[in-house]
């Protein structure tokens, strides 16, 4: 049986100044997944990001950290997907989510972008919203005028611990996600 998911993308912004910011929660997840799978990232200019190939028993899975900045993530995803003939429904995008309490996780196929500029660009470049999303809650600052500063700053020690715990829990669901066991993955990820 082959993997249902062929590409896992972590969203974030490139550069040292952004490494520890909330908006890079997707990168944090992908770094942990690559470590778990013993996959190494290397910069691939034709894919506009850092790419790793995980050779798994049920087939290769590509890992991608776009280097295009969050708002242009779709460019990197579309380039890798087109080259390896990966369909949108075979892609899992992992990203931070303001509208979910810090440390909580949501998993779904498709849906709106919730104002997330990275998701807007992905939908525009793929031509569809029908890709899987693993949403890592980072909380909302309470005022929409504070959002940009909030996502581009480091979380508190407590919030970072909660996000790290969510990443660890999400990693446990990856085998079910890869196998297409959507209900099992959703039930596990949505539980407290």
From Swiss-Prot:
Binding-site residues, tRNA: 18, 69, 71, 117
Sites marked Stabilizes the basic form of H active site to accept a proton: 96
Domain of life, source organism: Bacteria
Subcellular location: Cytoplasm
Catalytic site: 23
Reactions this protein catalyses: an N-acyl-L-alpha-aminoacyl-tRNA + H2O = an N-acyl-L-amino acid + a tRNA + H(+)
GO biological process, one term: rescue of stalled ribosome
InterPro entries in UniProt: Pept_tRNA_hydro, Pept_tRNA_hydro_CS, Pept_tRNA_hydro_sf
Enzyme Commission numbers on file: 3.1.1.29
Key words of the record: Cytoplasm, Hydrolase, RNA-binding, tRNA-binding
Quaternary structure and interacting proteins, as annotated: Monomer.
Name of the protein in question: Peptidyl-tRNA hydrolase
Lineage start: Bacteria, Pseudomonadati, Pseudomonadota, Betaproteobacteria, Neisseriales
Name of the gene encoding the protein in the UniProt record: pth
């Amino acid at each position: 049986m082959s993997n249902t998911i062929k590409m896992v993308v972590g969203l974030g912004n490139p550069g040292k100044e952004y490494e520890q910011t909330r908006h890079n929660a997707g990168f944090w997840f992908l770094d942990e997944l690559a470590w778990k799978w013993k996959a190494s990232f290397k910069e691939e200019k034709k894919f506009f990001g850092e790419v790793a190939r995980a050779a798994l028993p049920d087939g290769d899975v590509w890992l991608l950290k776009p280097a295009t900045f969050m708002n242009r993530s779709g460019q990197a995803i579309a380039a890798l997907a087109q080259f390896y003939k990966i369909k949108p429904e075979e892609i899992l995008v992992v990203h931070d989510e303001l509208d979910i309490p810090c440390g909580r996780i949501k998993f779904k196929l498709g849906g709106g972008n919730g104002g997330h500029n990275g998701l807007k660009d992905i939908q525009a470049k793929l031509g569809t919203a029908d890709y899987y999303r693993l949403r890592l809650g980072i909380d909302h600052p309470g005022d929409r005028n504070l959002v940009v500063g909030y996502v581009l700053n480091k979380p508190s020690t407590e919030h970072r611990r909660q996000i790290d715990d969510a990443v660890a829990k999400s990693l446990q669901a990856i085998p079910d996600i890869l196998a297409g066991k959507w209900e099992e993955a959703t039930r596990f990820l949505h539980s407290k």
